[in-house]
């Protein structure tokens, strides 16, 4: 009888271990940006030197806000993000804010989701996260440009 009890305990512990194995394994680049995200926060969206991009993916529910602060020479001097989503979305936001800092508006506009996906080594099922980051950058740049046009018009 004790042999049956011991075997049953062993089987249960092995089943628990199998059930706790993660379904998806993330590359260390994703894990690093997820566990230690860079540039989390917000900038003052009323500031004319700040562009704000807010994008979402209805299919998965990810929402990403990315903001840039641009100096008088057209150089991005700061970037912040807030993302509600999976680890890949957070990592994509974090990497995107790192990459746009120090770039001109034109250079930042050339950043592609494929660059983000390649750096993070995102699997095909997570490519939409890097697309969201690209869309958020483009939306932030567009918002900044609209503010600048309004400033010149006044």
UniProtKB/Swiss-Prot annotation:
Details of cofactor binding: Fe(2+) binding protein that acts as a scaffold for the assembly of iron-sulfur clusters. Binds 1 [2Fe-2S] cluster per subunit.
Residues of the signal sequence? Answer: none
Q: Which domain of life is it from?
A: Eukaryota
Sorted alphabetically, the Gene Ontology cellular component annotations on this record are:
cytoplasm; mitochondrial [2Fe-2S] assembly complex; mitochondrial matrix
Q: Does the keyword Repeat apply?
A: no
Q: What is the required cofactor set for this protein? A: Fe(2+); [2Fe-2S] cluster
Q: What does this protein do?
A: Scaffold protein for the de novo synthesis of iron-sulfur (Fe-S) clusters within mitochondria, which is required for maturation of both mitochondrial and cytoplasmic [2Fe-2S] and [4Fe-4S] proteins. Component of the mitochondrial core iron-sulfur cluster (ISC) assembly complex; regulates its activity.
Protein name listed in UniProt: Iron-sulfur cluster assembly enzyme IscU
Instruction: Name the gene that codes for it.
Output: IscU
């Amino acid at each position: 009888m004790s042999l049956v009890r011991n075997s049953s305990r062993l089987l249960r512990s092995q089943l628990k271990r199998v059930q706790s194995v993660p379904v998806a394994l993330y590359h260390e680049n994703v894990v690093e940006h997820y566990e230690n995200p860079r540039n989390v926060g917000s900038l003052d969206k009323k500031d004319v030197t700040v562009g704000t991009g807010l994008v979402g993916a209805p299919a998965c529910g990810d929402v990403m806000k990315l903001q840039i602060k641009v100096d008088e020479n057209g150089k991005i001097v700061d970037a912040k993000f807030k993302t509600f989503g999976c680890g890949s979305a957070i990592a994509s936001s974090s990497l995107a804010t790192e990459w746009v800092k120090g770039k001109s508006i034109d250079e930042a506009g050339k950043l592609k989701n494929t660059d983000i996906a390649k750096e993070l080594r995102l699997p095909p099922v997570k490519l939409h996260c890097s697309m969201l980051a690209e869309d958020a950058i483009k939306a932030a740049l567009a918002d900044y440009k609209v503010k600048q046009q309004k400033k010149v018009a006044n």
